């Protein structure tokens, strides 16, 4: 009896250790993914009629003196991550690799590409900041990012143009994916409105997509002066520089897409109050696109949402919020009602009415 119990305990212990090893080496997944994007494995496979052998890939990589065994080990891990598929060729000698659905998200020229997101979030300085999680747990307002870099993330991006470009490209890549889903799943949300301001709209990716889908809407891009200065011009989109903590341009509808999660509750209440002042009481609304956390849920997206919350803790001092959090926040800002609508994304759509 004793030996059976010991064996069972040992088996559980091994599984626990394996789980912990996987967590410990979580950074390896990020950096293997970065390497895969940097050397263009997904694009090479696509351009080789969708499949490739190890020897073919060795000859096509933008690297000199590739060790085929080292490359094989990298590919083996990508197969384990379900990024690549693997089959044995007809001759039974060489393995043939192809892209799994997840792997197609690494294609640099794809509309759905997450390659810019991977490169933006895995740059050295952004990984270095995670060494200061402990320091970011204090009762003050100083984030782990500030402890690591000596300034907040927004100032860092302002004074480091190369890193800012990588970050912006990553955000734009994420925005393209999210905006496409938003316009398909919530088309009725945008119908009937006459004017919209994208508050904190970055380089204008979202507002351009909205204008293309709904050309009758008068569209405005609003962000900090240095962000507006680096955004692309569009003949039918007004660009306004400013500070959302000071004022927001008036319109029937204001959009806050992945903005409020960057900020504390106090900052968010301030932003929302400025937004409420800028929309008409009878026909206006604020559209918030952000995570609505379900803390106890076993939904497949829950871990991704919780990771984003820790990301906010470390980098911006903001947070992802539950439905109850959103209700409290909007009440504090003076909104009379709101509704939360899930979409096919990590985020949800929250419509707030003055």
Swiss-Prot record:
Active site positions: 261
Keyword S-adenosyl-L-methionine: yes
Residue sites binding S-adenosyl-L-methionine per the record: 223
Family annotation (SUPFAM superfamilies): S-adenosyl-L-methionine-dependent methyltransferases (SSF53335), Winged helix' DNA-binding domain (SSF46785)
Induction: Up-regulated upon fungal elicitor treatment or wounding.
Enzyme class, broadest EC rank: transferase
Keyword match S-adenosyl-L-methionine: yes
PROSITE patterns linked to this entry: SAM_OMT_II
Pathway per the UniProt entry: Alkaloid biosynthesis; (S)-reticuline biosynthesis; (S)-reticuline from (S)-norcoclaurine: step 4/4
Catalysis performed (reactions): (S)-3'-hydroxy-N-methylcoclaurine + S-adenosyl-L-methionine = (S)-reticuline + S-adenosyl-L-homocysteine + H(+)
GO biological process terms on file: alkaloid metabolic process; methylation
A Gene Ontology molecular function term of the record: O-methyltransferase activity
InterPro entries reported in the protein's UniProt record: COMT-like, O_MeTrfase_dom, Plant_O-MeTrfase_dimerisation, SAM-dependent_MTases_sf, WH-like_DNA-bd_sf, WH_DNA-bd_sf
The protein's Enzyme Commission number: 2.1.1.116
Keywords, in A-Z order: Alkaloid metabolism, Methyltransferase, S-adenosyl-L-methionine, Transferase
Tissue-specific expression: Expressed in roots, stems, leaves and flowers. Restricted to sieve elements of the phloem adjacent or proximal to laticifers.
Database matches in PANTHER family: O-METHYLTRANSFERASE
Family stated for the protein in its record: Belongs to the class I-like SAM-binding methyltransferase superfamily. Cation-independent O-methyltransferase family. COMT subfamily.
Role of this protein: Involved in the biosynthesis of benzylisoquinoline alkaloids. Catalyzes the transfer of the methyl group to the 4'-hydroxyl group of 3'-hydroxy-N-methylcoclaurine to form reticuline. Also involved in the papaverine biosynthesis.
Protein name per UniProt: 3'-hydroxy-N-methyl-(S)-coclaurine 4'-O-methyltransferase 1
Species per Swiss-Prot/TrEMBL record: Papaver somniferum (Opium poppy)
């Amino acid at each position: 009896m004793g030996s059976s119990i010991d064996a069972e305990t040992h088996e559980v212990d091994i599984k626990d250790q394996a789980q912990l090893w996987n967590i410990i080496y979580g950074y390896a997944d990020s950096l293997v993914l970065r390497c895969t994007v940097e050397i263009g494995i997904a694009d090479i496979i696509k351009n080789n009629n969708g499949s490739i052998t190890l020897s073919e890939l060795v000859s096509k990589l933008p690297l000199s003196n590739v060790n085929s065994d080292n490359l094989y080990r990298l590919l083996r891990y990508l197969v384990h991550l379900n990024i690549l598929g693997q089959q044995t060729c007809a001759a039974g000698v060489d393995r043939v690799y192809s892209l799994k659905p997840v792997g197609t998200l690494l294609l640099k020229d794809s509309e759905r590409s997450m390659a810019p997101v991977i490169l933006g979030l895995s740059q050295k300085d952004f990984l270095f900041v995670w060494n200061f999680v402990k320091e970011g747990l204090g009762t003050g307002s100083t984030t782990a990012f500030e402890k690591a870099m000596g300034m907040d993330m927004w100032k860092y991006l302002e004074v480091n143009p190369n890193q800012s470009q990588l970050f912006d490209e990553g955000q734009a890549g994420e925005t393209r994916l999210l905006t496409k889903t938003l316009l398909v799943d919530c088309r009725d949300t945008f119908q009937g409105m006459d004017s919209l301001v994208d508050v904190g709209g970055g380089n204008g990716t979202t507002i351009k997509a909205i204008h293309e889908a709904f050309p009758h809407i008068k569209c405005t891009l609003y962000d900090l002066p240095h962000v507006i200065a680096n955004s692309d011009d569009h003949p039918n989109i007004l660009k306004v520089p400013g500070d959302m903590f000071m004022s927001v341009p008036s319109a029937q509808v204001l959009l806050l897409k992945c903005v409020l999660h960057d900020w504390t509750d106090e900052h968010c209440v301030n932003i929302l109050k400025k937004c409420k002042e800028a929309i008409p009481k009878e026909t206006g609304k604020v559209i918030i696109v952000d995570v609505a956390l379900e803390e106890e849920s076993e939904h497949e997206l829950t871990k991704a949402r919780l990771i984003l919350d820790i990301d906010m803790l470390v980098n911006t001092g903001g947070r992802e919020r539950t439905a109850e959090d959103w209700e409290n926040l909007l009440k504090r800002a003076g909104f009379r009602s709101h509704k939360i609508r899930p979409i096919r994304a990590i985020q949800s759509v929250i419509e707030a009415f003055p």
